[in-house]
UniProtKB/Swiss-Prot annotation:
The family this protein is said to belong to: Belongs to the TrpC family.
Keyword Amino-acid biosynthesis annotated: yes
Catalytic activity from the UniProt record: 1-(2-carboxyphenylamino)-1-deoxy-D-ribulose 5-phosphate + H(+) = (1S,2R)-1-C-(indol-3-yl)glycerol 3-phosphate + CO2 + H2O
Record has Amino-acid biosynthesis as a keyword: yes
Broadest EC class assigned to this enzyme: lyase
EC number from the UniProt entry: 4.1.1.48
Extent of the signal sequence: none
TM helices/strands, residue ranges: none
Pathway: Amino-acid biosynthesis; L-tryptophan biosynthesis; L-tryptophan from chorismate: step 4/5
Protein name stated in the entry: Indole-3-glycerol phosphate synthase
Highest classification ranks of the organism: Bacteria, Pseudomonadati, Pseudomonadota, Betaproteobacteria, Burkholderiales
Amino acid sequence: MSDILNKIVATKHEEIAAARAHRGLVSLRDEAEARTDVRGFEAAMRAKIAAGQAAVIAEVKKASPSKGVLREDFRPAEIAASYERHGAACLSVLTDALYFQGCADYLRQARAACALPVLRKDFMVDEYQVHEARAMGADAILLIAACLDDAQMADLEAVALAHRMSVLVEVHDRDELQRALRLKTPLLGINNRNLRTFEVTLDTTLGMLGEVPSDRLLVTESGILGRDDVQRMRAAQVHAFLVGEAFMRASDPGVALAALFA
């Protein structure tokens, strides 16, 4: 694990310990199980692709460790509604506070403002966070292979699937890809950003295409900044995208989405 990932994971364990002291796991799990309003994340993406369109997971993100604040005037509900109007398949909402200036309320606000399925984007290392995700309204979670061993990934996936949530597993290299393929989820994200160096290259996705089984729904993540990037991916039969920074810097994120995928 890179230094930044080690720091983030250590922070997560501290946050979870504090949260558990405030509210027990059983109470949280009961609240999560009581929610029956799961929106179909995978289904929304497959519907876009079946219609010949790009399936865009549009990100609601105020800041990042590498770029700092991306959007000063940050209004999650307005951003979510704009994304929905302009063709997003799903949302991804950052809930990490320390490194991305996110929070659970941002996810709640974004989800309440639209009918799109919502991914809780955070660094998931404990089942407590998965129950927390469903309790706050998330329809899907992200598992980052670089942060987890095989047993942890399988355990967290099982908790999410028990809540009828979708799971997007994120990889960056071939070793992580092979580990991810042992999971049940068909949703596979390839992050074009090296989490050790923060360098971005679309060749990361393109170089692994031949090793991705046809039953997996591949999502390319990071580095999609222009229409030429989109065209390059779609020419390689990659039709699902997770995009954040390019939209967050635009005056109207939804208009930027429509322009990028026109």
